[in-house]
């Protein structure tokens, strides 16, 4: 047989076939799909069920670098979860602090701090001519519920972020519990309230009561370092009577001087409602054609909140026994701030009988035969505002009892300037709940604008209410004191770091405070009450309660029985009288 060459062998092969493995790749192995892989790949898991889905291409350059940049080219999974974990990975290691924390003493535990003197009838005292203003609720009937834990970003709440599921959710209790015999009539969210508007009326003075001392202008000077003045606790007779118990308002109502009656502290809360976060309540009494905006006995509306609008507001902390263990809780801070405001207004005036300014009538709530403490500097101005619209058949007038705290000589001459005096307080700039505030001792005079701007953000509702009260009273200026604790761990001693003055209208513009929106809210509530009782008998007394929801930016209007809260008031009075008798013994 003749030998064959390689060329002959190749030529003898079929032309349609090729030598070697098949060129098309088959992704099926015995009917099971599989993906090509490299034996050099280290697989940590059989499958990745946690990989990104439709959002894998979102996130921009950083997301691309994080997800795709350093992956293996051949045979790698689409997530780093396919990579084997290093045995000595310490990324999840953390250090636990097991040091003991010292227990802090609570400010005014077990009740409210009382402005010293006899009477002690509470904040919303009954009987127009008796009782001192009380700082706290005192009776423990839910006054502290108003300041329970809050959501993080004011009345808007906030969206959840990384690991927020693992954080304790903040919930608050209502300022007053809704009873079974109450009927809800209306629910309005703050977005709707913010759209209301009524041209702000100027108002006119009807009468004035009380007297004022002159403001001590030495407090306007920057204090010497480490030589600040201490805040003093002064014994003065101060009154905070609700609307329907005011004898002057009762007299004006009998003369048909107006249809709606209120006090500036109650009205300011209603006008600034969209800025509020904590729960509050207002009692509305409709008797005949008269409407009274009242506050109940022990209402939290009179307490001064602290950092209510801060992104990280103070929280309630309780131990296993349920007792408050911190002086920086919302309820403790509110008692402290109310005490500071009362005493600061008394301390910053020059008590001189020769130079005081006396109004047309004496203080309507003071009885010299019964009281032993001297009367505090306070002027009450009863002012009337026209809330009428063009389509109204009859005018709608509102009388408001406004307050001023002091007078000051006009620096350019002319009439004396009337002032309202308020105080902002710093508890601890490094503590939780401080809202990122600057250290007042070092920054108040060098960065005053930044300090005030931070307070506008953290205490929006408080400053808005004070500004509204000043405008309602037609005050010429506001004096804001900056007061800090002498020791951050003690709530009993305070120092005055400085005082800053503002004109109310200019301060309102800086805060973006729209009084037209506030008057629109008031007129809307009044119209709703009048429409509900349009078919009722004239002499029939109807009572309503307006409540701010503790956890949502919503207010609700309830119809309640006429005797609601009266039994609580009588029980509180009996308890206070019994306590007075025991103290005298």
Swiss-Prot record:
GO BP annotations listed: cap-dependent translational initiation; formation of cytoplasmic translation initiation complex
Sequence segments annotated as region (RNA gate): 300-314
Residue stretches of biased makeup (Basic and acidic residues): 43-60
Principal cellular location given in the protein's record: cytoplasm
Span list, region Disordered: 43-62, 109-152, 560-585
InterPro entries: eIF3d
Keywords tagged on the record: Cytoplasm, Initiation factor, Protein biosynthesis, RNA-binding
Family: Belongs to the eIF-3 subunit D family.
Domain comment, as recorded: The RNA gate region regulates mRNA cap recognition to prevent promiscuous mRNA-binding before assembly of eif3d into the full eukaryotic translation initiation factor 3 (eIF-3) complex.
Primary role: mRNA cap-binding component of the eukaryotic translation initiation factor 3 (eIF-3) complex, which is involved in protein synthesis of a specialized repertoire of mRNAs and, together with other initiation factors, stimulates binding of mRNA and methionyl-tRNAi to the 40S ribosome. The eIF-3 complex specifically targets and initiates translation of a subset of mRNAs involved in cell proliferation. In the eIF-3 complex, eif3d specifically recognizes and binds the 7-methylguanosine cap of a subset of mRNAs.
Protein name as catalogued: Eukaryotic translation initiation factor 3 subunit D
Species this protein is from: Neosartorya fischeri (strain ATCC 1020 / DSM 3700 / CBS 544.65 / FGSC A1164 / JCM 1740 / NRRL 181 / WB 181) (Aspergillus fischerianus)
């Amino acid at each position: 047989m003749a030998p064959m060459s390689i060329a002959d062998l190749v030529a003898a092969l079929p032309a349609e076939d090729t030598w070697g493995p098949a060129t098309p790749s088959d992704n099926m192995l015995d009917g099971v799909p599989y993906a090509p892989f490299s034996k050099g790949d280290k697989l940590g898991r059989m499958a990745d069920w946690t990989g990104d889905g439709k959002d894998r291409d979102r996130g921009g350059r950083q997301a691309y670098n994080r997800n795709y940049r350093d992956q293996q080219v051949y045979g790698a999974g689409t997530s780093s979860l396919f990579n084997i974990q290093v045995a000595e990975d310490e990324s999840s290691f953390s250090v636990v602090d097991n040091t003991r924390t010292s227990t802090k003493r609570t400010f005014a535990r077990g009740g409210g701090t009382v402005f010293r003197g006899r009477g002690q009838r509470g904040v919303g005292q009954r009987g127009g001519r008796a009782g001192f203003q009380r700082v706290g609720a005192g009776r423990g009937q839910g006054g502290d519920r108003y300041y329970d834990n809050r959501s993080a970003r004011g009345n808007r709440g906030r969206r959840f972020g990384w690991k927020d599921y693992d954080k304790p959710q903040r919930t608050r209790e209502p300022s007053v519990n809704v009873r079974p015999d109450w009927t809800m009539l209306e629910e309005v969210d703050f977005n709707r309230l913010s759209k209301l508007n009524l041209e702000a009326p100027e108002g006119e003075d009807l009468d004035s009561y009380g007297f004022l001392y002159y403001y001590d202008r030495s407090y306007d000077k920057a204090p010497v370092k480490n030589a600040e003045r201490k805040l003093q606790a002064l014994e003065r007779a101060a009154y905070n009577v609700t609307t329907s118990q005011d004898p002057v308002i009762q007299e004006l109502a009998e003369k048909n001087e107006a249809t709606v009656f209120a006090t500036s502290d109650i009205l300011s809360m209603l006008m600034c409602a969209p800025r509020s976060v904590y729960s509050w309540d207002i009692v509305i009494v409709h008797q005949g054609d008269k409407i009274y905006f009242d506050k109940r006995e022990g209402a939290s509306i009179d307490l001064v909140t602290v950092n209510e609008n801060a992104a990280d507001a103070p929280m309630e902390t309780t131990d296993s026994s349920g007792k408050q263990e911190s002086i920086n809780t919302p309820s403790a801070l509110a008692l402290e701030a109310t005490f500071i405001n009362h005493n600061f207004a008394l301390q910053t005036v020059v008590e001189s009988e020769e130079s005081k300014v006396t109004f047309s009538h004496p203080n309507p709530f003071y009885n010299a035969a019964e009281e032993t403490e001297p009367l505090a500097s306070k002027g009450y101005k009863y002012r009337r505002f026209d809330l009428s619209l063009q389509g109204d058949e009859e005018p709608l007038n509102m009388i408001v009892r406004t307050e001023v705290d002091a007078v000051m000589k006009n620096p350019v001459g002319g009439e004396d300037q009337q002032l309202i005096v308020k105080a902002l307080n710093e508890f601890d700039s490094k503590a939780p709940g401080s809202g990122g505030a600057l250290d007042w001792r070092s920054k108040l005079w060098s960065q005053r604008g930044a300090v005030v701007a931070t307070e506008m953000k953290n205490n929006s509702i408080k400053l808005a209410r004070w500004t509204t009260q000043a405008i309602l009273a037609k005050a010429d200026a506001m004096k804001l004191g900056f007061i800090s604790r002498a020791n951050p761990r003690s709530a009993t001693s305070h120092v005055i770091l400085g005082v800053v003055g503002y004109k109310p209208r200019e301060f309102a513009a800086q805060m973006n405070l729209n009084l037209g929106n506030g008057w629109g809210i008031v007129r809307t509530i009044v119209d709703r009450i009048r429409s509900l009782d349009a078919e009722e008998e004239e002499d029939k007394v109807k009572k309503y309660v307006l409540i701010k929801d503790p956890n949502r930016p919503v207010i609700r209007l309830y119809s309640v029985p006429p005797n609601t809260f009266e039994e609580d008031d009588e029980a509180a009075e009996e308890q206070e009288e019994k306590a007075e008798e025991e103290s005298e013994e």
